[in-house]
Amino acid sequence: MIKVPTSIYLRTLDCKEFDFSAFARTHDCVVFIYPKIGEDFELLSEQLQKTAGMKGCTKQAINYKKLLKEFNDLGFMVVAIGSQDIAAQKKFEEETTTGVMFLNDSEFMLERALELPVFAASNGHKFYFRQTLIIKGGNIRRAYIVDEPENDAKNMLEKIKNEDY
């Protein structure tokens, strides 16, 4: 268990600074961090292309949408964090209409603050590995690398229901 560090500032999709630290210290939440690689997929090494969980951002987001009320009823907000440019992220949010809070971390603040794993395409574009954090009481209770994006929401909901975090 890790206390959420201070001074993690991300961006909202309307480009406003957002104090993620203050938010995460005062809200229980499930944070899914997705790579949304897009065209850069072809520029990944063969090993990365074969890594489980590299594809599936849309399925992951839509499944969180389907279970959002259940997360909320258990006292958890759902937050989606991506590192692509804000225009692309805004388009993704509009396409999935999930109703979750989307935040942008194109500066990789979470990588520095929490040492979250990242990777890069051959053109230098950097991405987070797909991962989900369960935050409760201002503490990061668990961090999971996600290799089955389509099952992530269901799996996290089960962990919360069973207090397995």
Range-by-range predicted roles:
Residues 1-165:
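Chalcogenol-based redox active-site neighborhoods
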